[in-house]
Amino acid sequence: MMFVTGIVLFALAILISVALHECGHMWVARRTGMKVRRYFVGFGPTLWSTRRGETEYGVKAVPLGGFCDIAGMTPVEELDPDERDRAMYKQATWKRVAVLFAGPGMNLAICLVLIYAIALVWGLPNLHPPTRAVIGETGCVAQEVSQGKLEQCTGPGPAALAGIRSGDVVVKVGDTPVSSFDEMAAAVRKSHGSVPIVVERDGTAIVTYVDIESTQRWIPNGQGGELQPATVGAIGVGAARVGPVRYGVFSAMPATFAVTGDLTVEVGKALAALPTKVGALVRAIGGGQRDPQTPISVVGASIIGGDTVDHGLWVAFWFFLAQLNLILAAINLLPLLPFDGGHIAVAVFERIRNMVRSARGKVAAAPVNYLKLLPATYVVLVLVVGYMLLTVTADLVNPIRLFQ
């Protein structure tokens, strides 16, 4: 029951985020003197609407987005006589950019507010975790039977049998110096047989010989970064866990921006990798193992939201919602039509072009002809809709689950 409740709550949270995105456009458009004709949540047939002043507000049947209709967003629109002077395309560049940025800016603001609240209530990941290969726990070596799923095992592992303890710092594996846990794990994966491992304990270097055990792990294959099963070495250790850090009202502010900055970098990497994930999504639809690194749709996001609520992980629920708002902001700022970023690019181009013409003693040119940009816009739409259908299908037939 809580799983279903979580799905509904997260879907509602996404809808509210989209509605606030459109509110951002509407509020700034009004403040800069533009006319907002309609503000609707959802698509399809209208379920309810009312008119307040010059704006019609309403709710439509399909709760998968929303829109804010601003008069004269492009020069090809038909305008009523009272709208011509207030048409968006006739306004100063800074006003147009402000209106267009306000939507993604609202999603960014939601992300910052949520992360700030998390910093105060639950705490944020440690911004300065140990960079050395600190051992957190030792145990047996379990086979990774499927991606992310380990089989049961008992007894001590190779590291424990060799005397390695929690808190030890690994500095060398065989002839390979290591300065982080990832470097240590990579060196162990390439090793076999009895290997000397140097650890630091209470400031003293200790050499111990560890019998590397062969096991199966899912690791990147080096071609697009897709995970594939491979036989590698393992010694049965885990990295030391660093708990979250709680902040005060003022100290949470820089921490919030720092975490958001890190997330922004990761979102950029994820967007750049989208084309490489098509094959993994197709295989998942065909019954293959679903790579947890593949993109998800609103459906998949809601399922993950349901998992977090079902297990009482409200901090994960809100953090995931913050990430999703950051992703919405980043996607909408892509300099491609029909995204907000595409319209911003057109406005900036017109401004630069007219500045150059003015410097040459020429009058300002006519606004960009959006009809000529329609073919490129349709290509982007087809690619976006196609990718959305692919992710929705994968999320319906083979969703990413956090606790399975």
From Swiss-Prot:
Residues holding Zn(2+): H21, H25, D202
InterPro entries listed in its UniProt record: PDZ, PDZ_6, PDZ_sf, Pept_M50_Zn, Peptidase_M50
Disulfide links within the chain: none
A Pfam family recorded for this sequence: PDZ_6
GO cellular component: plasma membrane
Cofactors (names): Zn(2+)
Any one GO BP annotation for this protein: proteolysis
Coiled coil: none
EC numbers for this chain: 3.4.24.-
Transmembrane segments: 1-21, 104-124, 313-333, 373-393
Membrane topology: Multi-pass membrane protein
Keywords assigned by UniProt, alphabetized: Cell membrane, Hydrolase, Membrane, Metal-binding, Metalloprotease, Protease, Transmembrane, Transmembrane helix, Zinc
Active site, renumbered: E22
Keyword presence, Transport: no
Regulation: Inhibited by metal chelator o-phenanthroline.
Compartments, as annotated in UniProt: Cell membrane
Sequence ranges assigned to domain PDZ in this UniProt record: 121-203
UniProt key word Magnesium: no
The family this protein is said to belong to: Belongs to the peptidase M50B family.
Note: Was identified as a high-confidence drug target.
Name recorded for this polypeptide: Zinc metalloprotease Rip1
Species whose genome carries this gene: Mycobacterium tuberculosis (strain ATCC 25618 / H37Rv)
